[in-house]
């Protein structure tokens, strides 16, 4: 009788160990799968940030550049008049036009900063691309962790391959090695 109780206890303990191993392996696979999904969502969020931010940045820079172009055009036209002036009166008149153009321009646009805007644009673009690259790198790391787990010896025996398929990491699209053109 004692031998049968000991055998039942050993079988129960063995069954409990197997069940705990199975549940631990399964739960880790689920956790890794969710981490992969979250990581991909981070990549998508970085792409969405770029899609939302870049057009706004370009419009800001284009607006600043347009304002400065208007100022430069007015000053250049007035200055051309001075060069072509025949008399001192003409020279004085075009000088006043230059001063008026400059004063009006600076009153309308007290801080002419298109160069700073372009530098800000460049910094924002670089930061955005760095965020995307970091999200892709993190995604690939979570894929590696997930795939390593599901391909482990005991894990492979325990898990259903259809429920936990191998995942592919981020791969650049064809032509991605070429820098995109930016036109103003």
Spell out what each predicted region is.
Residues 1-184:
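A helix-centric hydrophobic-segment signal that preferentially recognizes long
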């Amino acid at each position: 009788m004692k031998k049968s109780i000991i055998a039942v206890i050993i079988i129960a303990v063995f069954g409990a160990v197997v069940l705990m191993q199975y549940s631990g392996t399964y739960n880790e696979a689920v956790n890794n799968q969710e981490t992969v999904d979250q990581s991909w969502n981070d990549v998508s969020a970085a792409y969405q940030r770029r899609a939302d931010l870049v057009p706004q940045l370009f419009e800001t820079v284009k607006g600043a550049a347009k304002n400065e172009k208007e100022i430069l055009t007015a000053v250049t036209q007035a200055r051309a008049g001075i060069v072509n002036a025949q008399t001192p009166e003409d020279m004085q008149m075009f000088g006043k036009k230059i001063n008026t153009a400059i004063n009006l321009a600076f009153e309308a646009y007290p801080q002419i900063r298109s160069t700073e805007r372009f530098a800000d644009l460049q910094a924002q673009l670089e930061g955005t691309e760095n965020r995307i690259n970091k999200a892709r790198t993190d995604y690939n790391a979570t894929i590696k962790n997930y795939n390593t787990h599901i391909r482990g010896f005991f894990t492979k025996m325990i898990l259903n391959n259809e429920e936990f398929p191998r995942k592919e990491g981020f791969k650049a699209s064809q032509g991605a090695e070429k820098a995109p053109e930016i036109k103003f």
